[in-house]
């Protein structure tokens, strides 16, 4: 979709025909927004700007020169915007081109709250957005505000996770999955905020932007630095939560091993006694012990062996309790 924002009377032309650009000049347009453009729309904008638009591969490159570069007739900047996907979010690359005449071109493939909010600001106070430079900075401002909301959202999720771990008796694999998911989201969020920090730093060093923009850039960089610190804190807290969760899992596993170990030790003396009296020797006097009472013969050897096994097991249990191992 091709959307054109005209300078005169803040007029917006949505779903514009590409041929419309043939009748317009740089003085007529502030902003050209391309949302999942057709080949015809893309070629029309390239012809109007006399500049090739960035491919998705170029936008996704991680080199610093691919994020911000100044050319003879234009400025090119590539960044990533977050797109909500249920409980998580994905990263969608966005490309910007600003001509020396102050015309902004944005290229994206996903609908974004950032652009809708920037459009509202443009319509409410279009006199404050005299050039595409101002619109570009406004887009970054809105994006930073939304990034702050995401950082706060992740921080709340981390706090909820920490509370759940402290109140639950057992830790299952779902908790570990939640920790890993939050770590991944926090890491991606921090990387993209850092990406915006680099873009703002490059703009601050540039001499092409209007002078009234630079004070705003100083405030934006401070906000970005604060967001990076908050994201770092959330990531460090997740590391602590992960260590705590793994520690609790180890304690649970040790308790299970302890039960089996204690059971084995308790029955070890009884097993030894049974093994001794189970040996097939000819001379084992205890086996022939008997006691005759009222015509009945009681096998004392058998009772002696059973009693000895019970006594040894009981003494072992008492010893463990005395040592507070049970």
Where in the sequence are the language-model features?
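Peripheral, non-transmembrane regulatory/ligand-interaction domains of membrane transport proteins
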Residues: 1-210, 219, 223-226, 301, ...
């Amino acid at each position: 979709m091709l959307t054109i924002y005209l300078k005169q009377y803040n007029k917006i032309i949505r779903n514009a025909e590409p041929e419309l650009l043939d009748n317009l000049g740089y003085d007529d347009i502030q902003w050209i927004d391309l949302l999942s453009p057709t080949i015809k729309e893309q070629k029309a904008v390239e012809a109007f700007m006399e500049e090739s638009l960035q491919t998705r591969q170029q936008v996704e490159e991680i080199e610093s020169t691919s994020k911000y570069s100044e050319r003879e007739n234009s400025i090119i900047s590539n960044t990533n915007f977050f797109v909500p996907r249920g409980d998580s979010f994905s990263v969608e690359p966005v490309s910007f081109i600003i001509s020396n005449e102050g015309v902004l071109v944005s290229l994206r493939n996903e609908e974004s709250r950032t652009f809708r909010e920037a459009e509202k600001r443009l319509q409410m106070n279009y006199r404050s957005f005299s050039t595409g430079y101002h619109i570009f900075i406004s887009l970054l401002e809105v994006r930073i505000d939304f990034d702050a909301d995401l950082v706060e959202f992740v921080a709340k999720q981390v706090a909820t996770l920490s509370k759940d771990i402290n109140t639950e008796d057992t830790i299952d694999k779902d908790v570990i999955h939640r920790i890993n998911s939050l770590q991944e989201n926090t890491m991606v969020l921090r990387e993209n905020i850092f990406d915006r920090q680099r873009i703002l730093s490059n703009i601050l060093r540039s001499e092409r932007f209007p002078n009234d923009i630079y004070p705003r850039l100083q405030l934006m960089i401070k906000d970005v630095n604060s967001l990076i610190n908050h994201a770092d804190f959330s990531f460090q807290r997740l590391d602590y939560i992960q260590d705590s969760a793994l520690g609790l899992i180890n304690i649970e596993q040790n308790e299970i091993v302890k039960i089996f170990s204690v059971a084995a030790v308790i029955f070890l003396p009884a097993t030894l006694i049974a093994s001794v009296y189970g040996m097939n020797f000819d001379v084992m006097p205890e086996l022939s012990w008997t006691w005759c009472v009222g015509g009945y013969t009681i096998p004392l050897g058998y009772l002696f062996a059973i009693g000895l096994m019970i006594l040894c097991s009981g003494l072992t249990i008492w010893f463990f309790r005395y040592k507070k191992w049970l």
